Swiss-Prot record:
Protein's UniProt name: Coatomer subunit alpha
Alphabetized InterPro entries for the sequence: WD40/YVTN_repeat-like_dom_sf (IPR015943)
GO molecular function: hormone activity
Tissue-specificity statement: Gastric, duodenal and jejunal mucosa. Circulates in the blood. Seems to be confined to specific endocrine cells.
Organism: Canis lupus familiaris (Dog)
KW Signal (keyword) present: no
Top-level taxon of the source organism: Eukaryota
Lineage, opening ranks: Eukaryota, Metazoa, Chordata, Craniata, Vertebrata
Signal sequence, start to end: none
Keyword list, A-Z: Hormone
Subunit structure: Oligomeric complex that consists of at least the alpha, beta, beta', gamma, delta, epsilon and zeta subunits. Interacts with SCYL1. Interacts with JAGN1. Interacts with TMEM41B. Interacts with SVEP1. Probably interacts with PEX11A.
Length: 35
């Protein structure tokens, strides 16, 4: 399963990759956390 995820943000504060699944966790400077 391939899913395209897109969001507009000026800056990303943190980025983390899941070791076994194709997931990316991002924390944005506006306080939003997205998986």
């Amino acid at each position: 399963m391939l899913t395209k995820f897109e969001t507009k943000s000026a800056r990303v504060k943190g980025l983390s990759f899941h070791p076994k699944r194709p997931w990316i966790l991002t924390s944005l400077h506006n306080g939003v956390i997205q998986l």
